[in-house]
Amino acid sequence: MAGPTRGFLGRRRERDPRLPPGQYDVGRDWPVLTAEPTPRVSPETWSITVDGRVEDPTTWAWDEAHRLPRAEYRGDIHCVTTWSKFDTWFAGVSVDTLFEAARPTADAHFVVATSKTGYTTNLPLEDVTGGRAWVVWEYDGGPLHVEHGGPVRLLVPHLYFWKSAKWVTKLTLMTRDQQGFWEQNGYHDLGDPWRQQRYQGD
């Protein structure tokens, strides 16, 4: 019995070079995943603090943060649950701008991001500086919705998205690494999607 006509099965779709190993393109969707109930945070009461190993601990209220130099990120994001979303557009302020005001001490090597809910995640200082991380309040030209971390979330797009803490209120600089919520529960300390660092030992 003859097999299928040549070309009937079509060509295998080439993998997008922007897609890390083990990920799939979620398209226009943006799945909602949280470690805790979604809080209701008013912009009028929100603030962001940089403290810990810094010369000048500093807090910015909503209006004060919006007066800082605007910064944007246009690119891709990747979730540890294997979805990736291409061509996102976020706006807010660069973490570099916040740290320039607070002035990290020479012995600061790590950062713990804390959410309004108490959720925490740890990051090496080098992964949130040098134009690699932002505190954002806009998505796709409008306010960031609460289910996606609004009014304000951390954005560290080169790492798996659990590192981009939703409803962020504090960045604490530290001399030593201190695991956050998911890291204490078996997730990788760094979370590089290109190295598939999903869990401890990966």
Which sequence ranges carry the predicted segments?
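Structured, non-membrane catalytic/scaffold regions adjacent to prosthetic-group chemistry
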Residues: A2-D202
